[in-house]
Amino acid sequence: MAPRRKEKYKLPVPLPEGKILDDMEGNRWALGKMIGSGGFGLIYLAFPTNKPNKDARHVIKLEYQENGPLFSELKFYQRAAKRECIQKWIQQRKLDYLGIPVFYGFGLTDFKGRSYRFMVMERLGIDLQKLLDQNGGFKKLTVLQLGIRMLDVLEYIHENEYVHGDIKAANLLLDFTNPDRVYLADYGLSYRYCPNGNHKQYQEDPRKGHNGTIEFTSLDAHKGVAPSRRSDVEILGYCMLHWLFGKLPWEAKLDDPVAVQTAKTNLLDELPESVLKWAPSGSSCSELVKYLMYVHNLAYDDKPDYQKLKKILNPDGVPLGPLEFSTKVQSVHVRTPAQQKVDSPKATRKPANEFPAKFPKKVHRETRARQREEQEDSQPTMLQSRPAAPENSRTRKIHEYSDIFSEMQSLQQTPSYMSFQGSYCKPYLDCTRRDPIRKPRSLPRYRHTPTGNLGVTDLESSPRFWPAIFQLTLSEETKADVYYYGITIFCLLIFVFLALYFL
């Protein structure tokens, strides 16, 4: 029995993770982590008890049994979206896929004296609203492709006597394993507009007015008329405007449903000038204008010409390619399943500037140490007044080398292997930025200032380097210092080579 319609539905008490649910076909499902909630129900990751998988490929949507939206969605899948029916449609229409989520089962369960209804669905990826929030809008080609994919879905569900009624970016989700596929989800407001082949009659009911998501809902819904096929294609038109420009003409009036209804009426009545005047200068939206003009001329019970609508959105018949959710400012990376593992915290917290190879990591540490040395040379007072930060052994060794060389004041060195021009590890590099990666500056050379009667100015280039050292006339104290530092440097070099070998 269908639950009674209520104005507001109660959000159910969450079920414990690990609870086993039995569907009507005898399949057993283990609840995983709760990943979402809506105005009426909760969404959990789920695992078949006989096939546990770290990458959860199923979700369970549940609500109190007396609630209504999940019941409506369940009836839609049972009547219109069985897997074998979808596959048959794909073959007949020669589609590569159809963007309707796969339905696996349903059932009832009890918890703390309350009865819950649940349904098992395939797991999908990120929704388009999150991508839209990051971008502010999509590329025109992406918007047109999304429209064509949604027309494929709408044609199928309309042929099976249903309308969706709530098309929006939050209800469009990318495939979990293939982000170039998009699915229309959430059929809680789906409506059987043509039961047993008899189309509902046009009848306005102010008590049911402004139903749906106010930004995108159709003029029929504003008037309290039951949704029809033209309602769905009209809603899709508003969505495409929003995806392309990141805004709608009535977005400042959302607190006043009547004002939104008036703005939509004016937009459709004054096409094409209304859209062309409102759209940003230099933008091209002729396809959307033609689409809305066609939709506006549909009668309440007309069947849309889906092929004509797709031809309007793709007049050249270009094959549909990958979906690109990016703008001129940034590019959104849609994660693959390997990056979406729900029970692997390391995968979700991976630093943006982490490099996979060992050698670049070492270069990064050395470059940071070099930058610190340069800052100490240029701002000694600031560094002395600032608390010392913890250093690793590699950094301490570099500081020791600097102290030794400054005390000896007798050697001139060229940059070591740490300063090679091919380095791409700029100090404190933010790898999430799209700025060109700049090469690090070379290490500063230690210049020798001649003092006393020493005649050697470049000991490295001298062919008699070590004989010159032993022929120098030095005091006993200076000789002791030279031997001491020589042994120290030799030992430190051994430690450095050992450290590099085992890193």
UniProtKB/Swiss-Prot annotation:
Pfam families: Pkinase (PF00069). It comes from the Eukaryota. It is a single-pass type IV membrane protein. Residues 334-353, 362-395 are annotated as: Disordered. SUPFAM superfamilies: Protein kinase-like (PK-like) (SSF56112). It is an enzyme of class 2 (transferase). The keyword Disulfide bond does not apply. Residues 29-313 form the Protein kinase domain. Belongs to the protein kinase superfamily. CK1 Ser/Thr protein kinase family. VRK subfamily. Interacts with MAP3K7, MAP2K7, MAP2K1, KSR1, RAN and MAPK8IP1. This is Serine/threonine-protein kinase VRK2.
